[in-house]
């Protein structure tokens, strides 16, 4: 039985008691024992049996009565801890019932009446938590789910009275009450989309999908609190999240900020926090959509995580969300004041991870010079690529463009060797860890490629792209991926014939010397001829 139905049972009991006011002393004193059973016996044996059921699309639509319902659709949910706390009201008096009725079904206000009488039971494989006569007595009880298994949304707290007016005989009381609270399973899931962000500094998208509890919308029930909380890595710019909030399923509806939800961001000690808080109108829309939909009708929150261009993403980037699906007192989260906590409020998701690693590129040559500074000045760009038998084919990480562009990594597109012929590329997403999942089987598409766009003085450019991989095992240990690029001296080290101005001058001088030499020889020959004659 849903909590609203339980409260209706409470209201019905109160109404029946009020209707039987003639049987109750107007002074508020307890009525004498009634042999017909129309007044409450304060010493009667009482029991409360909780049937814990999984919420489906077809159960939870009939109002509970407090009686056992053998026909109830109930797939049991085990390992749910129920805590019942007796309220400080006397149900043997008119005033006690009126105190409850004046709360107008507000369970939170009922919590102010709690006593110190508390009992706990955990459901077994049959989904039952049976509070016996030894654990209960005549009175009103606040019933809470104080522990649930992972991925189970707890039902709302509710108030139940022992006894309740017997609906099958309204002249009598039912001291053995049965209730059927429902749980929605698989409450919250989170996914990361980092495939379009191979280089650090690019946007990463987080999608949080949460189940919506089913309530009796036509009967006036509404979800009383609904918050999606995201624990953000401090490197994410919390002021630039630009959330998109939708109800997805049979009929998709995009919710409007301010009207349907508010975004509250706050700074914590080790993390930042973002809370999507549904407004009253947003909760109404969610309640209506879930009632008219099915189990696939869910709330979806998409957050666009932005970073500073030169952000250090080396290692793991972890993100976890939580869901607060109702107004249970167990959920004490204050979105404006997270304090120093690192715990995820509500029902947590499994953490989603992105893994980025550093690449250290070392430039050398086949001549293996001792002076490594000779390899400085080489420039490289990085692409995603597909390895082929003959080399690699470059790809564009942005399919919306018609050109193949180099990756922007840490705000840079070109990386130049310096120092001892090296350059760091910070940082690249691991090829074997994409969109939050480990890739056990890598393919020829899972590569990056280096393209040399400028060679050092005296060396050839690389003729082909150079494929390499960044692996998660190294990234998570913050161990650099080392890539060595070996250049060949220009023209493979062979000298070419001299050309240009220097060569022409040399030939001119050589020609002049030959001419001068010839003139000297001719003059000498002439002198010898004259001397003979």
UniProtKB/Swiss-Prot annotation:
Location in the cell: Secreted, Cell wall; Fimbrium
Domain of life from the UniProt record: Bacteria
Propeptide: 500-533
Sequence positions bearing Pentaglycyl murein peptidoglycan amidated threonine: 499
Motif (LPXTG sorting signal): 496-500
PROSITE patterns: GRAM_POS_ANCHORING, TAT
Transmembrane segments: none
Sections of the chain in a coiled coil: none
Main location: secreted
GO CC entries: extracellular region; pilus
Membrane topology (UniProt): Peptidoglycan-anchor
Keyword field contains Repeat: no
GO biological processes: carbohydrate metabolic process
Keyword vocabulary terms for this entry: Cell wall, Fimbrium, Peptidoglycan-anchor, Secreted, Signal
Gene3D superfamilies the UniProt entry points to: 2.60.40.740, Immunoglobulins (2.60.40.10)
Signal peptide extent: 1-30
Keyword Signal: yes
Chain's role: Major fimbrial subunit of A.viscosus.
UniProt protein name: Fimbrial subunit type 1
Phylogenetic placement of the source organism: Bacteria, Bacillati, Actinomycetota, Actinomycetes, Actinomycetales
């Amino acid at each position: 039985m849903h909590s609203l139905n339980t409260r209706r049972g409470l209201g019905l009991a109160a109404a029946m008691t009020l209707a039987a006011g003639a049987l109750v002393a107007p002074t508020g004193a307890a009525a004498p024992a009634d042999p017909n059973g129309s007044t409450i016996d304060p010493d009667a044996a009482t029991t409360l049996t909780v049937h814990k059921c999984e919420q489906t699309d077809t159960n939870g639509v009939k109002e509970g009565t407090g009686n056992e319902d053998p026909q109830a659709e109930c797939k049991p949910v085990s390992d749910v801890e129920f805590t019942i706390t007796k309220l400080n009201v006397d149900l043997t008096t008119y005033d006690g019932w009126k105190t409850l009725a004046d709360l107008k079904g507000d369970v939170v206000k009922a919590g102010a009446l709690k006593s110190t009488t508390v009992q706990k039971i955990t459901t077994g494989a049959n989904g039952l938590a049976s509070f016996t006569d030894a654990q209960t007595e005549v009175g009103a009880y606040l019933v809470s789910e104080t522990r649930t298994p992972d991925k189970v949304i707890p039902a709302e707290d509710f108030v139940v009275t022992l006894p309740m007016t017997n609906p099958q005989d309204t002249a009598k009381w039912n001291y053995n009450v049965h209730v059927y609270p429902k749980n929605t399973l698989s409450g919250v899931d989170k996914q990361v989309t980092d495939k379009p962000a191979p280089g650090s500094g690019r946007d990463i998208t987080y999608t949080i999908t949460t189940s919506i509890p089913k309530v009796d919308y036509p009967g006036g029930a509404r979800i009383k609190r609904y918050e999606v909380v995201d624990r953000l890595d401090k490197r994410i710019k919390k002021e630039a999240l630009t959330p998109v909030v939708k109800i997805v399923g049979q009929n998709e509806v995009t919710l409007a900020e301010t009207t349907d939800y508010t975004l509250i961001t706050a700074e914590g000690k080790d993390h930042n926090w973002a809370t999507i808080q549904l407004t009253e109108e947003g909760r109404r829309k969610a309640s209506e959509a879930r009632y008219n939909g099915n189990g696939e009708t869910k709330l979806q929150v998409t957050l666009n995580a932005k970073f500073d261009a030169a952000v250090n993403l080396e290692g793991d980037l972890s993100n976890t969300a939580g869901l607060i699906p109702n107004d249970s007192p167990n959920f004490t989260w204050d979105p404006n004041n997270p304090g120093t906590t690192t715990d995820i409020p509500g029902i947590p998701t499994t953490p989603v991870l992105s893994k980025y690693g550093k690449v250290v590129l070392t430039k050398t040559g086949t001549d293996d010079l001792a002076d490594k500074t000779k390899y400085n000045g080489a420039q490289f760009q990085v692409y995603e690529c597909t390895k082929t038998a003959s080399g690699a084919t470059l790809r564009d990480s942005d399919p919306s463009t018609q050109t193949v562009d180099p990756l922007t990594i840490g705000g840079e597109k070109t990386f130049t060797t310096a120092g001892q012929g090296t350059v760091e590329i910070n940082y690249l997403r691991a090829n074997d860890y994409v969109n939050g999942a480990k890739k056990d089987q890598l393919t020829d598409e899972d590569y990056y490629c280096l393209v040399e766009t400028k060679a050092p003085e005296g060396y050839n450019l690389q003729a082909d792209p150079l494929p390499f991989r960044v692996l998660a095992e190294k990234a998570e240990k913050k161990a650099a991926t080392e890539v060595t690029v070996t250049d060949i001296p220009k023209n493979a080290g062979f000298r070419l014939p001299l050309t240009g101005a220097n060569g022409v001058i040399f030939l001119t001088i050589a020609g002049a010397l030959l001419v001068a030499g010839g003139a000297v020889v001719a003059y000498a020959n002439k002198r010898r001829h004259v001397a003979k004659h």
